[in-house]
């Protein structure tokens, strides 16, 4: 591997992404597939690119990602978090701008567990007066 490689681990919901960034031409590879091929929906692709567009490094870095667990939204969020951490490793001066955009903080929201006696996490069974 290259000597100038930067790493960041990103997490969101049940997804975990391992992100490797190095100098290049702007290729983003997710699980051995190009970004456009891996994510079918445009919003997920947009979420992944957000930190790179913010610091204007879209065509300066090659990003290699392995991501596990969760669905499309969770994986996209995990990749975004990982890219943000890799960028901060590359240049600590980028931290304030990334923080103000809200990319540094890990989104702690997870699926709430189903409770006994309820139909879902909070949905109660239908009540009948008579």
Swiss-Prot record:
Domain of life: Bacteria
InterPro entries: Ribosomal_Su5_D2-typ_SF, Ribosomal_uS9, Ribosomal_uS9_bac/plastid, Ribosomal_uS9_CS, Ribsml_uS5_D2-typ_fold_subgr
MF (Gene Ontology): RNA binding; structural constituent of ribosome
Gene Ontology CC, one term: cytosolic small ribosomal subunit
Entry keyword set: Ribonucleoprotein, Ribosomal protein
An example Gene Ontology biological process: translation
UniProt similarity note: Belongs to the universal ribosomal protein uS9 family.
Protein name per UniProt: Small ribosomal subunit protein uS9
């Amino acid at each position: 591997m290259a000597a100038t490689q930067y790493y960041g681990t990103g997490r969101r919901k049940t997804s975990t992404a391992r992100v490797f960034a190095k100098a290049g031409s702007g290729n983003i590879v997710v699980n051995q597939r190009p970004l456009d091929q891996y994510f079918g929906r445009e919003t997920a692709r947009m979420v992944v690119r957000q930190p790179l567009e913010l610091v204007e490094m879209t065509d300066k870095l090659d990003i290699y990602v392995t991501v596990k667990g969760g669905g499309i939204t969770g994986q996209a969020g995990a990749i975004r978090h990982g890219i943000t951490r890799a960028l901060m490793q590359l240049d600590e001066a980028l931290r304030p701008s990334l923080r103000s955009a809200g990319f540094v903080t890990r989104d702690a929201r997870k699926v709430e567990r189903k409770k006994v006696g309820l139909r879902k996490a909070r949905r109660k069974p239908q009540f009948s007066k008579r």
